[in-house]
Each structure stands twice: as structure tokens, then as C-alpha cells.
Amino acid sequence: MFNLFLAVFPEIFIINATFILLIHGVVFSTSKKDDYPPLVSNVGWLGLLSVLITLLLLAAGAPLLTIAHLFWNNFFRRDNFTYFCQILLLLSTAGTISMCFDFFEQERFDAFEFIVLILLSTCSMLFMISAYDLIAMYLAIELQSLCFYVLAASKRKSEFSTEAGLKYLILGAFSSGILLFGCSMIYGSTGATHFDQLAKILTGYEITGARSSGIFMGILFIAVGFLFKITAVPFHMWAPDIYEGSPTPVTAFLSIAPKISIFANILRVFIYGSYGATLQQIFFFCSIASMILGALAAMAQTKVKRLLAYSSIGHVGYICIGFSCGTIEGIQSLLIGLFIYALTTINAFAIVLALRQTRVKYIADLGALAKTNPILAITFSITMFSYAGIPPLAGFCSKFYLFFAALGCGAYFLASVGVVTSVIGCFYYIRLVKRMFFDTPRTWILYEPMDRNKSLLLAMTSSFITLFFLYPSPLFSVTHQMALSLYL
């Protein structure tokens, strides 16, 4: 029992830390004695410290739990897969917060609630990852979504940010309604919401008549809700506008964190049952459509953030290959792809934030970056080459393993489409590199030095992207264990 308490202590800690920071901000930001001080940087550092402590608590608690455990009225499950996804989520949150401080100064952004909302959404996604019941899963998704709606519109003086928040609210509410309808259909057909009970019903009993059709429709609606949340085609239409209009740190967070938690839920919900083949076909077609649209639509973009938005859609297609395979190797490749995508995207948006210091918005503004800031240009080039899947960078290892898993399960067409779209994607990634090194800018821009936080973040993520191929075995071994733990 004591070991189980230590295992769930990270969630307890970060929830308490979030509310303490909220009280701290409310009390001191309204203090007339202290002349109403701006607390966003102060709360930001404390929030980053809270995330890092939670990360250490997770790492310390992992060896204490040798088997899977259910806790809090069996609504949540703690196992190796949970640990992996939660650690990746906290790394992404820490990276997002660490790149925010210079943004606060440049934009004169002094709303400390920004950090509190990031922490609150992180809490909800930690619960999403460990959720083992449809009710717990849906409530965690809704808490996460409410935080994201406010974060997208947090830059109140920008009409683009306000528009992004409103669009996200309307479309997100629509997708949540679809998800809830699917959960209610499953409950109405089976009388169960717990994943263990659903697994027994779907695998151990004969389901006939109305119950069978009700379960199928419920799973279909849940799948649509999930695909909307991860911006898979054809449910992607909201992503480019919202990614572009939101503040850049929010865009970075939206590009990474929800995908980690939703893919964890996808594997939890759909790993069992007699409807796996149908779901694999749905993800098969969404994967192909996402890869094709992500590659072709990105070619026409002129803005950096919109290009990264379509690149994100394309990478969701690649990651969906892993689930489409329906094998242990497929799930392992999905986790590898998700891990490398998260760290590469943190790197890319940290560079975009560094460019924002001089209001770089369009791809054309990157002209001659190699002459004005060669280190930043080289780092951005490494990131783009990794996105394109050029060896020996980490992105190549990710795509190689995903395609290898597709070939292993006989999905030759899926692997072929992935290779072709990767080649097409090389065009717009290399176009960025060509713009930085060989083009003359419309106006010369003198880039300011980066702050220490982003420099350290870029150094760590760039080192991982560049040197991963030298020793990939630990990640391959860990992800294989995580994939196996889903079936235990």
C-alpha cells in the first residue's frame, strides 16, 4: 500500500503545486503594498521547478511498481506504459515552459494564469494517460480541453489569438460531444465503463443483435473524437488556423502534449476486442490521408507556423502507421515515433520563438540567417533534416522503424505511401534550408542573442537528434517493454 501511495504521489504533488501557485499569484499580484508586481516569470520558474520535481518523483516511483495496479476506485491504472507516457508528457511540459520566459518579456505578457493553465492541463493529461474507465477518461479530456481553449486565446490584444480560441472552443466542444456520445452508446450496450469489463465483454462473450451494433457505433464515435483531437485527416481542418493564431508557446504545447495523452488513450481503449481489424482500417486510411495532405499542403505555405502545423498533421499520419499494424512491433514503433516527434518539435518551436524576437513570421524572412546567426541556422537545418527523415538523424530512425513495422505486418501499400510522402516532404524542409543559406533576404535582420533557457534547451534536443543513432538500443528496449505491458 505504501509503495502504491508513492507511485501515485507525483499526481498528488503537481495538483497541490498548481493550486499553491494559483493562490500565490492571486494574493501577490493584487498586493497594493508591493505595487501590483508582475508574477508571470516568478510563477513560471516555480512551475518549471514543480514539473521537474514531478518528473523526479515519477522516475523514483517507477522501480517500486513491478506489476500493474489499479487505484482510486479502479478508475486509474499504473503500469510501465503509464510511466513512459507520463515522463514524455512532463518532458514536453518542461520544454514548453522553459522556452516561455523570453516570450513573456518580448510580448510584455504578465498574466501568471498562463503558467497555471499549462500546469492544470498537464495534471489532466497525467490522469488521461492513467485513466482506466470511460468516465475518468472523458472528464480528464474535458479538463484538458477547457485549459487549451483559454490558452489559445490568452493573448487578448491579438485578434488572431481571440479567433483561435473561439474556433477551438466551438470545434473542440463538437468533438467532445462526439466522444461522449460514443461512450454513452458503449455504456448503453454493455452496462460497463471500466476497461477491464469492456475487454472481457468484447473478447470473452458472443455479442449479437442490437448490442453488437451499439458497441460498434460507440467505438466508431470514440475513434472519430480521438482522431479529431490528434488532428488526423479528415478531422484536421481546425489545426492550421488555431496553431497560427495561438501564442507560439501554446502552439508548441498543442503540437505535442495532447497527442501524447490521446495516443495513450487510443492504445488503452482499442487494444482489446473483436473490432480491432475495423479500427485498424480506419486508422489505415486516416494515416494515408494525413501523410498525403501533410506533404502536399505544406508545399504551398508561406508562414513558418502554418508549415509546422501541416508538418504536424503529416507526422500524425506516420505515427498512426504503428497502430494500423496491430502488432507489438507496431505499438513499439508508435511509441518510438511519438518520443522522437515530441523532442524534435520542442526543438523546432524553440527556434521559432528565437526568431520571433525579430518578428520573423514568413519563410522569406529567413533569408541569409546563416550569415546573421550561423549557429541558429545550423540547428534549424538539423531539425528540418530530422523531420524529413534524412539519415543518420533521429527522424530517420523513427520513420525507418515505422515503415519496418508496416512491412512486417504486410501493409506494403502503407509503407510505400509513407516513403513517397517522406520524399515529397523533403522538398519544403530543404527549401527552408536553402532559404537560410543561399537566398538574399528582402530586408536584412540583425538577430538578437537567445536567452540562456532556449540555448540550453536547443543544445539538449539538438544533441539528441544528432547523436541518437549512435546508441538507440535503450529507447528500443524501453518501448518494447511498454508495448508488452499493455497486454499484461
From Swiss-Prot:
GO cellular component: mitochondrial inner membrane; plastid
Pfam families: Proton_antipo_M
Membrane-spanning ranges: 4-24, 45-65, 84-104, 111-131, 134-154, 168-188, 215-235, 252-272, 282-302, 308-328, 334-354, 375-395, 400-420, 456-476
This enzyme's EC code(s): 7.1.1.2
GO biological process, one term: ATP synthesis coupled electron transport
Alphabetical keyword list: Electron transport, Membrane, Mitochondrion, Mitochondrion inner membrane, NAD, Respiratory chain, Translocase, Transmembrane, Transmembrane helix, Transport, Ubiquinone
Molecular function, one GO term: NADH dehydrogenase (ubiquinone) activity
Disulfide bonds: none
Compartments in which it is found: Mitochondrion inner membrane
Alphabetical list of InterPro entries matching this protein: NADH-Q_OxRdtase_suN/2, ND/Mrp_TM
Bilayer topology annotation: Multi-pass membrane protein
Substrates-to-products reaction catalysed: a ubiquinone + NADH + 5 H(+)(in) = a ubiquinol + NAD(+) + 4 H(+)(out)
HAMAP family: NDH1_NuoN_1 (MF_00445)
Function as written in the Swiss-Prot or TrEMBL entry: Core subunit of the mitochondrial membrane respiratory chain NADH dehydrogenase (Complex I) that is believed to belong to the minimal assembly required for catalysis. Complex I functions in the transfer of electrons from NADH to the respiratory chain. The immediate electron acceptor for the enzyme is believed to be ubiquinone.
Extra facts: Exons a and b and c, d and e are cis-spliced, while a trans-splicing reaction is required to link exons b and c.
Homology family: Belongs to the complex I subunit 2 family.
Protein name: NADH-ubiquinone oxidoreductase chain 2
Lineage: Eukaryota, Viridiplantae, Streptophyta, Embryophyta, Tracheophyta
